């Protein structure tokens, strides 16, 4: 899936966060958005994810203009996002976290926990994640919690995955593991948007830099 942003402008009152931004994200590439805090990187991705509406400009998927009125529209179009601050509930299990908001249902619409567990196992096996579907989120290290967020996006068929400052809370070892995961995802055809201000990490993993 090829994703394009053309002339995206986003204002908040008198402040212009994004001024006529053009960006192309190619299929299977890791595209880094490099810049200091406050540069407008996260705002631009929130526009792409449907959390903000652009004041000007267009989003195109495979050359076709699309409009996202909310994150649900972006998810349906194949876009996933892992926020810097994870959107997880500590007392939920991994499987419950994956199912939340997108519940695999059984007969009569009842949530199928086994189906949710199966999803975790399948996606984890595909990318070499070590995730126990029945583990509680609050018992997982930060790196594993981040993988839960990635699995959650992939289980919704994300073809473009936005990672917002993903290494900010990781140890050096967890950062190296994430770099490996990103490359595996890209090699499988998933496009990665890597928001960061760390040049060393960009040099290590990015195919393109903006």
What does each of the following model-derived ranges do?
Residues 1-210:
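Glycine-rich phosphate-binding loops of nucleotide-dependent enzymes
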């Amino acid at each position: 899936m090829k994703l394009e942003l053309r002339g995206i402008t986003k204002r908040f009152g008198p402040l212009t966060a994004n001024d006529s931004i053009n960006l192309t994200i190619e299929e299977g590439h890791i595209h880094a958005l490099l810049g200091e805090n406050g540069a407008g990187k996260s705002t631009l991705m929130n526009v792409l994810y449907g959390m903000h509406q652009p004041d000007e400009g267009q989003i195109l998927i495979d050359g076709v203009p699309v409009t996202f009125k909310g994150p649900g529209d972006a998810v349906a179009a194949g876009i996933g996002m892992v926020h810097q601050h994870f959107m997880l509930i500590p007392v939920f299990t991994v499987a419950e976290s994956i199912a939340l908001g997108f519940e695999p249902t059984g007969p009569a619409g009842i949530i199928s926990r086994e189906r949710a567990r199966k999803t975790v196992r399948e996606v984890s096996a595909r990318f070499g994640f070590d995730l126990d579907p029945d583990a509680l989120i609050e018992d997982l290290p930060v790196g594993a919690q981040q993988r839960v967020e990635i699995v959650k996006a992939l289980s919704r068929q994300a073809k473009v995955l936005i990672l917002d400052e993903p290494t900010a809370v990781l140890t050096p070892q967890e950062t190296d593991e994430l770099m490996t995961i990103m490359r595996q995802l890209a090699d499988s055809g998933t496009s990665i948007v890597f928001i960061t201000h760390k040049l060393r990490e960009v040099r290590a993993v990015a195919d393109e830099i903006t």
